[in-house]
Structures are given as C-alpha cells and as structure tokens.
C-alpha cells in the first residue's frame, strides 16, 4: 500500500516530491525564481502554485494578480499565463506534469530566441 509523503518546509532547504512518489502523474517542487518573462500557454497540461513566503505575481491575458503566502493558484491547460517574483524573497511550491518539468529543463538550456520552437515540442506556445 502506498504511504503518504510529508515534506517539512521549515528552514531554507529545497525539497521535492518527484515522479516515482506520484505514480509519474505530477511533481511538486519548492522554487524561488520567476517564470518566463513572456505570456505563454500549455495546451495539454495543468499547472499550480502554492505560495509559502513572499509575493508571487501572475499575469494573465486580461489581468495581473499579486498573491501572498497561503495562496494557491491553479491554471488549467489552455489558459495563457506567466508569473514572476518581484522584490522580497519568495518561496513557493509548483505542481506540474512531467512534460512541463521537461519543458522547463529544455528552456533553461536553450537560447531565448529558440524558446518558441522548444515550446511547440511540448504542446505549448509563446503568446507575447
């Protein structure tokens, strides 16, 4: 029988719950940095964030929302978005699919001018 996984987020350590623990359906990571500086969409993958400390700002097509500790944001597939950390130290959990984790890794190792092509490979697109 599977066991629950409990991660203590006190202190400065970065901890994660990976694929093996979730049956390869999603991953949970503690992050501190901003997302891409462009509005983008994932056509087939949902994504969520839970702010642990500080402020995380989300930009959508028609609005910008500032979130603080204790706030959870769920972005279903097909919803254009981006997010960023402005100012104070921020810690948050990001809950994403294996495909989105692979996309992030690919973007981090690719020059900015090639991000559009990389996004297409992962059923995603840059909008602005």
Where are the predicted features?
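A short glycine-rich, His/Asp/Glu-containing loop-to-beta-strand
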Residues: 3-40, 45
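Short strand-coil-strand connectors
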Residues: 10, 59-63, 86
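Ligand-binding loop in jelly-roll beta-barrel domains
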Residues: 22, 69, 77-102
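Short, charged/polar surface micro-motifs in flexible loops or helix N-caps
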Residues: 22-24, 34-36, 55-57, 64, ...
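Short, conserved beta-strand element in jelly-roll/cupin
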Residues: 30-32, 41-59, 95
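A generic structural motif
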Residues: 34-36, 46, 53-55, 78-80, ...
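Short acidic-glycine-tyrosine-enriched beta hairpin
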Residues: 48, 62-80
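Double-stranded beta-helix
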Residues: 88-128
